[in-house]
Amino acid sequence: MLNHTERAEVLVHALPYIQRYRGKIIVVKYGGNAMISNELRETVINDIILMKCVGIEPIVVHGGGPDISDLLNRLNHKSEFINGLRYTDDITIEVVQMVLGGKVNKNLVSLIEKFGGKAIGLCGMDGSLLKAKKIESDNDLGYVGEITKVNTEILKTTISSGYIPVVGSVALGEDDNKAYNINADTCAAKIASALKAERLILLTDVPGVMKDPKDISTLISTLRLHQIPKLCLEGIIKGGMIPKIDCCVEAIRMGVEKATILDGRVPHSILLELFSNEGIGTMIY
């Protein structure tokens, strides 16, 4: 337990970082075990509220894969994945809208309100916040889309009114006005890019990019863009890490200052990443 002096020193240590990020937009993709564990969920929400309280402008983007699968199971409708993406037929897209625009989104908003923050829940269909087109691939994915446009004014208005935007990753078709399921990492990256955010943070269930996935001491703390192709060729960046890295790279090329892949299983990982020299994830810039 910290004594009073040590607590004061922690706050003083954080001051330069608070000053650095004050007024800056930081997009947090919220997912993984941090959404499932009640304890972790509360620490993430408190981190986000604290960011807002000290003048940082957080935007929360979320998926809801486990909840979508759970509801589909209860409807006796099979979940099917193709290359890591959920095949989204007519029934599935209805469930996606209910979960991402309803249950998960509103639960996060109510939790933020419970702990003293102010939040507004949105999905990409609200005010045409997110426009998308169908992903064309060799294997038909159904109503799975890629974002073509972000209505930044909705987010800026929400922020300037003192609220934390909480965005569910479902979008409106640019041509057919139908709902499209969007990968949450991609959604967060597109929003960060459109707003030229200071930081993009992807919460996940691994510490970051590691040379040896079984050895935390091999965590790569910082990555420059030019180093990434070599790590892919060496097989260090592989599997599910590849699309996350791709999201970060795209965001940086579109004007985001830095992107971080962060272990959401670590309590207060967002604050540890933002308010210390060392950070705890893999920062890409």
Curated annotation (Swiss-Prot):
Q: Which organism is it from?
A: Clostridium beijerinckii (strain ATCC 51743 / NCIMB 8052)
Family to which the UniProt record says this protein belongs: Belongs to the acetylglutamate kinase family. ArgB subfamily.
Q: Please state the protein's primary subcellular location.
A: cytoplasm
Reactions the enzyme catalyzes: N-acetyl-L-glutamate + ATP = N-acetyl-L-glutamyl 5-phosphate + ADP
Protein name, UniProt field:
Acetylglutamate kinase
PANTHER family from the entry? N-ACETYLGLUTAMATE SYNTHASE, N-ACETYLGLUTAMATE SYNTHASE, MITOCHONDRIAL
- Please name the InterPro entries in this protein's record: AceGlu_kinase-like_sf, AcgluKinase_fam, ArgB, Asp/Glu/Uridylate_kinase, Glu/AcGlu_kinase, NAGK-C
Q: Which UniProt keywords apply?
A: Amino-acid biosynthesis, Arginine biosynthesis, ATP-binding, Cytoplasm, Kinase, Nucleotide-binding, Transferase
User: What are the record's GO terms for cellular component?
Assistant: cytoplasm
Question: What role does it play?
Answer: Catalyzes the ATP-dependent phosphorylation of N-acetyl-L-glutamate.
Kindly list the residue ranges recorded as spanning the membrane. Answer: none
